[in-house]
Amino acid sequence: MALEATAKSVNFPKRAYVTFLAGAGDYVKGVVGLAKGLRKAKSAYPLVVAMLPDVPEEHRCILESQGCILREIEPLSPPENHTAKFAMAYYVINYSKLRIWEFEEYDKLIYLDGDIQVFGNIDHLFDLPDGYFYAVMDCFCENCPERVQWPAELGSPPPLYFNAGMFVYEPKLSTYHDILETVKVTPPTLFAEQVILI
């Protein structure tokens, strides 16, 4: 029986959802909501939580009780040339999110920010053709100026690009190293790692 299970796991590509978590704050509640949403939508795939060492044991226990796979990652600091002020100070920890490209035990992953709510099954996104990076276009304030204005203190709005809160990708160490090299030569932006990925 064990051999049969092993053979089956070899025949089927390994897929999972992945999210990022750092610190002892309330963000864990969003990740719990994400895990519950994926279960309610009857997703066939697990949720991997890429987390920094500062996530407390209490939060880890909560996530494990929700069926999450916990994967501790080391913090990744921005390079010295990225000392600019970010739109939000906590964006600096988001460079660590780039480590999810190291998760080569999976063939394909769907990254979801921990504060995303899943209302329907999105497993079909795993079936998109391999070899591509899939993401959704970011929605900037100028798309709905009657509701939200781009803050003048942030300067000109950035060019159109995707939102790094949801994307489909294939983890590879070579891609991870290419991203790190790109970070070194890319001027810093207000949105930390998000612009690096475009």
Role assignments for model-derived ranges:
Residues 1-198:
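Glycosyltransferase catalytic domains, chiefly GT-A lineage
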